[in-house]
Amino acid sequence: MALAVRLLPRLLLSRPLPGWAARLRTLSSAEVKRPLSGLCYLCRRRLGSGAAPFPRVSWASAALALSARGPQRPLLSPLEVASTLPTFPSCPRRTYSTEEQPQQRQKTKMIILGFSNPINWVRTRIYSFLIWAYFDQEFSITEFSEGAKQAFAHVSKLLSQCKFDLLEELVAKETLHVLKEKVTSLPDNHKNALAADIDEIVYTSTGDISIYYDEKGRKFVNILMCFWYLTSANIPSEAISGARVFQVKLGDQNVETKQLLSASYEFQREFTQGVKPDWTIARIEHPKLLE
């Protein structure tokens, strides 16, 4: 019985299997062991196990063993390495330089601090609230000041170019008639000084706000705006009282002279019911330029 139990697995594994199934058999211990297992790579000696001493091999014997195997060809020769590497177009480059890199030109920014009269500031805020409460719910003195700044830059440019026909809907008729007589008689350098670039306007201030009714019951609001701007027009400094001269450095040698001028524009709007909600310029003043 014991012999049958020991032979049964071998009989089952040695029987031919149907179809494509492979035939399994038990491998012997000699077949399982690799021929080079347990051998040293240098001296081909069998490595001991347990308490057997490990054979010591000197560097001389190791060198003799390697030389006995014969010269070995390297995996890649220097020429083959160079040929296998991809070739890229050579670009001229400078790794070190003693020359100083040119520094970028820094822009000079002018900051002008203006301090308004505290009484005038409080008065302006009170009238702004009255306009918002009784006339226009969308009115804001901050937004109005920004719009007045853009209008000043646009109107002053047209005024310096004597394009009075384009100013008919922006300036009051009486004011425009007076401006025609004054501007046409100005020299060219004074005409150029009338134009204010929006980027050259350095300060804006609210001068005065007034609310009044006329005899017919119409409601009006007037807001006086004061502007300070820089101009490059060639005007003698003694020709304009109160003007300030600034020298703006553009580079290492170029120096541009600019003058700080002021102008006052009074904006007017009628809040009578049924009237177009448009702001017009009722007064324009350029000290010493338009007199």
UniProtKB/Swiss-Prot annotation:
Signal peptide: none annotated. Its main location: mitochondrion. Keywords: Mitochondrion, Transit peptide. GO terms for cellular component: mitochondrial inner membrane; mitochondrial matrix. Residues 1-96 form a transit peptide. One of its GO terms (molecular function) is ribosome binding. Promotes sorting of SMDT1/EMRE in mitochondria by ensuring its maturation. Interacts with the transit peptide region of SMDT1/EMRE precursor protein in the mitochondrial matrix, leading to protect it against protein degradation by YME1L1, thereby ensuring SMDT1/EMRE maturation by the mitochondrial processing peptidase (PMPCA and PMPCB). Interacts with AFG3L2. Interacts with SPG7. Interacts with SMDT1/EMRE (via the N-terminal transit peptide); interaction is direct and takes place before maturation of SMDT1/EMRE. This is m-AAA protease-interacting protein 1, mitochondrial. It comes from Bos taurus (Bovine).
